Swiss-Prot record:
The protein's role, per its UniProt record: Catalyzes the deubiquitination of SPDL1. Plays a role in the repair of UV-induced DNA damage via deubiquitination of ERCC1, promoting its recruitment to DNA damage sites. May be involved in the maintenance of photoreceptor function. May play a role in normal retinal development.
Protease keyword on record: yes
The species this protein was found in: Danio rerio
Protein name, entry field: Ubiquitin carboxyl-terminal hydrolase 45
Record family assignment: Belongs to the peptidase C19 family.
Listed Polar residues bias regions: 419-440, 469-480, 532-545
Domain USP, chain residue ranges per copy: 192-802
Domain of life per record: Eukaryota
Regions of compositional bias (Low complexity) in chain numbering: 502-531
Primary location: other
GO molecular function, one term: zinc ion binding
PANTHER family, per the entry: UBIQUITIN CARBOXYL-TERMINAL HYDROLASE
Catalytic activity, EC: 3.4.19.12
Keywords, alphabetical: Cytoplasm, Hydrolase, Metal-binding, Nucleus, Protease, Thiol protease, Ubl conjugation pathway, Zinc, Zinc-finger
Amino acid sequence: MRLKDPFSLKTADMTKRSNKPKKPRDEDSSDEVGGLTCQHVSRAVDLSSVKKAVTGSLWSVCSDCLKERNVLEGETAGAHDILVCLKCGFQGCNQAEVQHSTKHQQAHHSDSHCITISLTTWKAWCFECKEELSTHCNKKALAQTLDFLQKQSAKATSGTSSKLIKLREEPAEYVDTQRGKSPVNSTLIPVKGINNLGNTCFFNAVMQNLSQTHMLNDLIQDVKEKGHKMKISPSTETNLGSLTVTLPSPEPLTSAMFLFLQSMKESGKGPVSPKILFNQLCQKAPRFKGYQQQDSQELLHYLLDSMRVEETKRIKAGILKAFNNPTEKTADEETKRQVKAYGKEGVKLNFVDRIFVGELTSTIMCEECEHISTVKEAFIDISLPIIEERISKPTNPARLGKSGREQDSLTSHDDSLAAHSQANRNSRRLSGQKLQSRHSSTSHDDRGPDTVSSRQEEDLCVAGRGLSSYRTDTMGSQSDCSEKESNLQDSSNDADSEASESEWSPRIPSVSSHSSTSDKTSITTTLSTTTHNPSLKSNPSSTPLPSIRPQQGGAVEQLVSAVSKLGLVHTSTDTLPISHSQEELSETRDRDRQHHQGAFQVLCHSYTPSSKECSVQSCLHQFTSIELLMGNNKLLCENCTDRRQRQMKRSDKKAEKVYTSARKQMLISALPPVVTLHLKRFHQAGMNLRKVNRHVDFPLLLDLAPFCSATCKNLGSGERVLYSLYGIVEHSGSMRGGHYAAYVKVRTPQRKPEQRRNQSGSREACSAPQGQWVYVSDTTVQTVPESRVLNSQAYLLFYEELL
């Protein structure tokens, strides 16, 4: 039997249905009137599913073409038609070459996906009946769905340009297969304006900086198509060889990012529309729907982390395919071991981790037993509080307890130091309150200075895991100054909703700095990172600080004293020995002293900020300086608690938890090729939301060595670690209404990604690369002098590694 082509109606078919002759009845159909009603309508039409799918996706764009990167942004729409599946809302094209709509119906043949509506002719077609359907049949659902789609079309086309996308016919015109070359005749990436979709300046400013991130443009080429080969080399201790896996097609958000970056590099006039990318992001993070006021740093987190999740899923799928997709039931123990080993290394190869993700190490040392705990966590940016000069109000001593009076006397010796300590206390992400040695730890008395526990290895393996789940501290959001002002209550509610939405996926935390949720106060004293004496003696030029631990020698001697005071005659064999020769005690103290000094040692000389300095370096100095955990903010030391319990083993009473004074420091232990610094200008002060407008100086060339651990990966002691500024996100205005803009540096790419860190000894002679700074505010693009850049009110700073 000859099948009629969908929607290929003769002239007679365009007349009224009353005058239209009946079509030949399909012998397999039970319809009473051919072409008018269909028995599949009741099972193949689901209005609620269509509404959910259509409102959450880009209108009139083939989903499969978008996934396969067969579309480009900013171009006139092609002549092909889009058919909407009335079962699930899938939008597919009817091109002769691909027929995505037909393939969708065939893929879901068992579940009725056979009825579609054309977004061009508004005609319904049943693939099972192979006939056009009447939208006025005895089923109301079909007519209601058509009405919804027509209203949705009116909404989508009323405020948007017809120049959205077009099919890509010649990929070779803009994709250069040679790494390191630009698709145009120059190696410089041009700067184009980006259309504001409605309160999306926060998005546009970030995308301008990402489009000028050369390494991102290079590495994303690897995910542009299905079948990319990836070589995974596990650690030598696994006794496994390298494995080459074939990756499946990239996920929608990563595909949309690739298309956007390509459109930004295309030569041509006019701004670029980010609609495809923005809509895909809204699918991952619904909080950005509705075109409300938002925050650039939050946007950057959601965007990078969502792409990272997609790429991790893609890499895992490639590894499982290499092992013939084993399951928990079918795989043997050896296969499980190999899959786990390759997966552990493979997930680290996603392009987000390779470009933006670094590592920080938080070191905490108990002042009583000198047990050292370390916590390593990944970051995609470092949030730095801006130091504000404030006049501290006098505190009534009568309202303080004993510990409060001790703390007050400690801080009264130096007002300036106390003010800085207050800022330092607010800058810490980790509270000393009830910090336990559940953290991955190294202990001089148990494992030796170089032994790392298995818990630490787990922390390093599980990317995106830190001490807590991701949480952003930015309260409220900002938008264009031409937009309507939002009240403080709305901003507060927006921040509250963010906390619940942040659980949508495992997330790499930013190294955010916020105050402890406890109402207890900790006294934090900023010390030079070159001071390593466990007694924490202060600089002789300053007023001496009272000791925070008894000067009775080492930990063993303190334990001897404690045992003698308790009057315990018998000790169990698992307690530390209390009798040593003087030589053994001396050797132990020397070894411990060296280990403790190394734990708090930086890569090179520490940075010393000048008086009243407010710069990126002074903020980093504050972030990485040593602080004391004491008073009501002491450390809950499990090591001391265990020792107390062993000493009281013969007693029926359970030893109380031991809280001790401690030292804590956060240092960078692994640097990514691109370091993003977030200046915390927005925060909550009491019941109010406020913005810090103080200018922060930032260098064009930043040396991060003073803020890196001495054990920082791939770096030698005493080296300079230079990073060059290439992008800024600026916020102007207030909390109620403001505007985001970008400054980007157009420059020649330094080198290919595989050449990074392969050279050494050339850091001293490095200088910032030459280039032209460009100011971009949505569609406004203009070149600016360097002086204007340095005077901007920076919110996000993008630095790239220099060799």
